Amino acid sequence: MTQSSMTRRTLFALGAPAALVAFAACSKSSSGTSNSTTSKSVSTPDNVVSFNWPEITETELRDDTGYHLNKLVDGAPTVTLYNDYAVFECAKAELAYEKAAKDLEGTMNVTVRHHPSPNSVYARNSALAVLAAEVQGKHLAMARKLCETQEEWRRSAFENLRVKFKDYAKEIGLDVDKFDKTMDDKSIADLLYADQEHAFRDLRMVRAPEFTVNDKVLENIDFNKVLENVESSTPAEYLVKEFKKAAGLSWFVRF
């Protein structure tokens, strides 16, 4: 699905959760400067990942295809990651996908939507935290923070989860009180519900991560190639190739 004229210029001009309401149905700073490449190692009993994030700019742009990770190009195909920040594989996919977003600048619109497990309060609340940070122009910063600290907040007692997220909000430079209130705002919940409904009802997704191109699920993605050696450029290169193939683009097409 390409961008419609009705939704294609959806900067957060309205400022607060109200800006999100209009589109529910369908990192660095908010100044627009680019993120510095950062690297943080995270380990689990079976996994170690160094999150060497790419230098990409926070777009502060959302439309009915999700939150944009690269500059919107009118008429270009759209690829979307459906993510669950409580899933370790999703954290790895986020890293590869952000690198792909940078490589696809000017060729494809790269967006992300939420697909948290309906049975996990940790999954739901982490999605709400990213959405609340997005209102203050820090989608990427919060998403990256949750990926880097996943084992920490997933092991917290549920009653301490909001405290953890508020600590992260402070670390990435958010207005913590505003962040806390926004997490409980109905417009944020509505936006999350819209993502979940589209993933489950319309696309029949039962897991995360998943990818779509022009709103069609990519059935043949080899997730071993996405998730192995994710610190290297290889997974992103694989994703770029698969996304372009699904969109019917040659390797060199730019819009």
Language model features by range: what are they?
Residues 16, 147-151, 184-187, 197:
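Short amphipathic alpha-helical surface patches that mediate protein-protein
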Residues 7, 20, 135-138, 151, ...:
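A generic secondary-structure boundary signal that marks alpha-helix termini
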Residues 80-86, 91-165, 170, 234:
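Structural alpha/beta surface segment adjacent to cysteine/selenocysteine redox centers
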Residues 2, 7-118, 245-255:
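Extracytoplasmic thiol/disulfide redox context detector
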Residues 77, 127, 209:
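Residue-level detector of short, conserved catalytic/binding motifs and their immediate flanks
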